Amino acid sequence: AETFVRLSDEKNIDKITVKDIVEACGISRQAFYYHFQDLLEVIEWSMEQAFGQLLDRSLQEDDPEIVLNDFIAASENAAPFMQKLFRSQKREQVEWLMARCVRSYLQELISAKGKLPRIPYEDLDIALNFCTYGFVGLLLECCDKKKTVDRETMARQMYRLLQGRIGEADPVRA
């Protein structure tokens, strides 16, 4: 996966082949296919690893604003590679993978933190979908190199939104 990211610095993502990866890694095609079915699975594995690491850090933190700030920072750090993926023919699949990873991240975080009141599954499902696509939209915005993001402000705004307090004055700016 790291080799794929490195190769994306040298050539267009749509032009990277399994042959390029196996040559750069010094492994056989058989070894590649033992671990991955195709290049999209490499991207998927890479995203799952990144969100897994983010989840581990998030579970160690008690302050939701810091968790959100870390989430935004991770998005900014991944932005150069994500921009390349979004300009590729794989954009639609990458957006779907991102939504799946974000939803899994949120579900695991909620489950581990146990901070939600008992709500019916259908309500939790719609809340997860709503948050997932809101977060993915913000991630896409963070990946837009033309837009600069104030992480701390965005984290506060997201936290107030999740608490249903978005219309209230920002205590930091007041």
Stretches found by the model and what they are:
Residues 21-43, 74-77, 81-85, 89-104, ...:
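Basic/polar phosphate-binding segments, predominantly the helix-turn-helix DNA-binding elements
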Residues 46-53, 78, 82, 104-113, ...:
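A short secondary-structure junction motif
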Residues 58, 82-86, 113, 142-146:
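Secondary-structure edge/capping motif, primarily at the C-terminal ends of alpha-helices
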Residues 65-80, 129, 137, 152, ...:
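Amphipathic alpha-helical segments that line or abut small-molecule/effector binding pockets
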Residues 69-70, 91-116, 122-137, 163-167:
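Amphipathic alpha-helical packing segments from all-alpha helical-bundle domains
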Residues 111, 141-174:
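C-terminal peripheral helix-coil segments that are non-catalytic and often amphipathic
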